[in-house]
């Protein structure tokens, strides 16, 4: 078979060499490095590796997003002879392919003409040891499924560890989205796939340092607006309630609430802007399926991490919760209860030590 591997890059000098030298396969393959405008040593490093290793091509774009770079790679697949690619992968530039594992995917793909996707497990680097990502724990054995049979696939909104039939090169990432550009393309591919082969082995390891898209107020606003938009779009694409619940759980719990925790740890003072953004998100949840516990977890994040509450901001928060059927006490009683909860939490933490 013939495999095309797309790697979108931009200022990845710390990891790109490790990734490129980790890619090995018995199959005929080519690597397309699509650079979005690196200003560090990423491009010189790729050019040096082109002289050392076969199969590497470099395409340079200017001021291009990750989505634009991936789309350029997909266009290259469509523009070349159909026999040049039977399948493709997109690999994050901060990842590596674990030794001997790439051909686990290619072997599964060749095994059955109905296989349109092969999905392996992803790993993360924990003190130098590769650990299975919790979202991939449902892949317990090698088997063939569909999205209808395995809705847990919707918790894996990442290209890493996935091999696609070349026919899906007609799909595109959303260039208007900075963080969730791949959600729709992945869902469409899963929905269109005749069969999906799951491989219960860790294929790709992620070396990425956790960089949050919510470090300041403007970034946080853009990020929340984006995930509300993609959540609505994808929920409208999913026909089965179980699929919608699994996808919304991933977005509400991991993308929204985890980012909210990080933002409020950095900016604990409760502001009108913060409450309004959380209100907008909570209200958007009411128009689709969601896991009720996630709503309470979001509320707990705001109340427990927030500081410097005043009467006006609390009343906005209280009225928001009343609109979704959740009662809250008066301002003074809330402050007393909150103080007690925080004291109990600190005491419990001290006892654990």
UniProtKB/Swiss-Prot annotation:
Is the Transferase keyword given for this protein? yes
Keywords assigned by UniProt, alphabetized: Cell shape, Cell wall biogenesis/degradation, Glycosyltransferase, Teichoic acid biosynthesis, Transferase
Please state the span of the N-terminal signal peptide per the UniProt entry.
Answer: none
One GO biological process term: cell wall organization
GO MF term list? glycosyltransferase activity
Q: Which InterPro entries does this entry report, sorted A to Z? A: Glyco_trans_2-like (IPR001173), Glycosyltransf_2 (IPR050834), Nucleotide-diphossugar_trans (IPR029044)
User: Which enzyme class?
Assistant: transferase
Per its UniProt record, what CDD domains does this chain match? Glyco_tranf_GTA_type
Which Gene3D superfamilies does the entry mention?
Spore Coat Polysaccharide Biosynthesis Protein SpsA, Chain A
Q: What is its EC number?
A: 2.4.-.-
Q: Please state what the protein is called.
A: Putative glycosyltransferase TagX
From what organism does this protein derive? Staphylococcus aureus (strain MRSA252)
